């Protein structure tokens, strides 16, 4: 049905399966391919097999160096603390990341949650990533951590995230996530980075911009490539790119992801007039100046311009903006 809408003859279509992490890897490598060898890191909650992929791309081919499998997941570790801090998994991670700078990462030691000893990366499943009867339960809901974690850290957050100890737990899990990722990259991808300095990353874990900043600042990384649609929707592009490249065809670099619809001022005004909510509208002479004024006064604004971006990131055309001055800004958003 979809193929018919796209005017593609289904009889001429061949279905080619591509592994989840390979699709992630392809999305960040094949669409930014270089003549130099490129280190590849994919951090994911879970795929059909692995959830951490470390490898490299060279001459259009992707080579695996190391993969880790559930329940040993960096994203799973972060998700468990997101759950403990009172947020929904796969939704609240950015709030934890956003509040982390307001805490002291060294006030509480969370290193018992996961360790890398130079060979093995292991998550402590007695504390997090638990399943079945070992899960901590409250109000008939099972959580992604155990009763032992609650005994170690105290009750799951129900109050203000900026309160002690929760704001410091947010800072500590962010630091642990960064430190373990850097250790894995240095151990498994160090030689590739020494050769070219190129690192391409994808997967839901690469939505963590604080981690990305750490990777970009790493002395061995000269060029950091982050696929804009680094979550699962981006694997559609990655899988297609993987198959095309496997056939020997080189792809054009992806210059941007502003691929969606755009609307004129007149269309926006007409939409306001037709809305039952009857929103008040005003045409501004200098929208940027007004936006700065509102942000400085602690307001939250929606920024809307040009074509809609593909993927989960606000890249400037469809963005919710707020000043990061206040510790409560994540809660407000």
Q: What do these predicted ranges mean?
A:
Residues 178, 202, 234-236:
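Alpha-helical transmembrane segments that form the membrane-embedded catalytic/substrate-binding core
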Residues 81, 181, 204:
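Conserved hydrophobic/aromatic pocket- or pore-lining residues that grip, position, or stack substrates
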Residues 3-25, 29-151, 155-160, 186-192, ...:
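Flexible beta->alpha loop and helix N-cap segments adjacent to enzyme active/binding sites
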């Amino acid at each position: 049905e979809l193929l018919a809408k796209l005017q593609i003859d289904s009889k001429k279509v061949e279905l080619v399966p591509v592994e989840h992490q390979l699709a992630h890897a392809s999305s960040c490598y094949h669409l930014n391919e270089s003549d130099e060898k490129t280190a590849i890191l994919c951090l994911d909650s879970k795929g059909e097999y692995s959830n951490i992929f470390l490898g490299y791309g060279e001459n259009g081919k992707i080579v695996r160096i190391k993969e880790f499998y559930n329940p040993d997941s960096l994203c799973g570790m972060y998700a468990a603390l997101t759950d403990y801090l009172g947020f929904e998994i796969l939704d609240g991670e950015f709030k934890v990341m956003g509040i982390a700078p307001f805490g002291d990462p060294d006030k509480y030691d969370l290193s018992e949650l996961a360790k890398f000893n130079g060979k093995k990366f292991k998550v402590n499943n007695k504390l997090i990533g638990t399943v079945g009867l070992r899960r901590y339960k409250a109000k008939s809901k099972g959580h992604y951590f155990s009763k032992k974690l609650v005994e170690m850290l105290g009750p799951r957050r129900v109050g203000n995230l900026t309160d002690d100890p929760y704001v410091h737990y947010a800072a500590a899990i962010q630091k642990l996530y960064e430190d373990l990722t850097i250790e894995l990259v240095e151990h498994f991808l160090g030689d590739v980075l020494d050769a070219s300095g190129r690192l391409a990353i994808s997967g839901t874990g690469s939505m963590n911009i604080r981690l990305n900043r750490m990777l970009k600042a790493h002395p061995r990384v000269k060029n950091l490539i982050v696929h804009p649609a680094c979550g699962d929707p981006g694997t559609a592009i990655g899988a297609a790119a993987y198959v095309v490249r496997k056939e020997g065809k080189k792809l054009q670099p992806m210059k941007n992801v502003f691929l969606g619809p755009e609307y004129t001022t007149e269309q926006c005004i007409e939409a306001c007039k037709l809305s039952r909510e009857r929103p008040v509208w005003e045409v501004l002479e200098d929208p940027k100046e007004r936006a700065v004024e509102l942000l400085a006064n602690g307001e939250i604004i929606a920024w809307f311009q040009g074509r809609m971006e593909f993927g989960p990131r606000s890249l400037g055309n469809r963005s919710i903006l707020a000043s990061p001055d206040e510790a409560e800004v994540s809660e407000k958003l």
